[in-house]
């Protein structure tokens, strides 16, 4: 297993370095000819706040309520103009504003350290935060609204002859997604 940015995973799959990748599709892999995919998870988004933030006691938040906040932007890949970034910038536009992005990184730990240091807030998939119990100066509030989730896919090249991949995909196809 490798932990890479989504653009590195997509490139590795397209260059046949990987048989299968599990990723958020920030590069729009699903539109590539010869690539098949299956949704394996839908992760809800949460707002990471420092404990003293005025919104930290809320039970849920909408993207519209984040207008004017300094955003520590968790980008799914290293390129600053990816399909994934465009998708999320569109979500902000639909909420009626352009976000004030103070910092941009694909590194969850850096983002969370900056939130804890009260530098800003961040939107993250819940799989990045759901095991962080009693995190110092961090609070996670669900982001609500239609489409406020991240879809995780398994993607592979349809022409890949690896017999283990074929068996793995067959097994994957028999499982029910957890959402």
Give the predicted meaning of each segment:
Residues 1-30, 105:
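Central regulatory/effector-binding core of bacterial HTH transcription factors
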Residues 6-18, 89, 93-95, 108-119:
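Short helices/loops that flank or line small-molecule/ion binding pockets
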Residues 24, 63, 69-95, 162-165, ...:
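Secondary-structure junction motif
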């Amino acid at each position: 297993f490798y932990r890479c940015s989504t653009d590195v995973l997509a490139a590795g799959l397209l260059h046949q370095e990987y048989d299968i990748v599990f990723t958020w599709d920030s590069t729009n892999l699903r539109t590539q000819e010869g690539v098949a995919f299956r949704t394996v998870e839908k992760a809800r988004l949460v707002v990471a706040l420092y404990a003293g933030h005025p919104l930290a006691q809320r039970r849920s938040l909408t993207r519209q309520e984040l207008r004017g906040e300094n955003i520590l932007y968790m980008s799914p890949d290293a390129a600053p103009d990816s399909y994934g970034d465009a998708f999320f910038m569109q979500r902000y536009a639909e909420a009626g504003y352009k976000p004030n992005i103070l910092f941009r990184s694909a590194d969850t730990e850096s983002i969370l350290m900056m939130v804890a240091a009260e530098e800003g807030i961040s939107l993250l998939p819940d799989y990045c935060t759901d095991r962080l119990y009693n995190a110092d100066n961090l609070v996670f509030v669900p982001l609500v609204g239609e489409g406020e989730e991240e879809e995780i896919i398994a993607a592979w090249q349809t022409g890949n002859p690896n017999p283990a991949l074929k068996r793995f995909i067959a097994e994957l196809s028999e499982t029910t997604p957890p959402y």
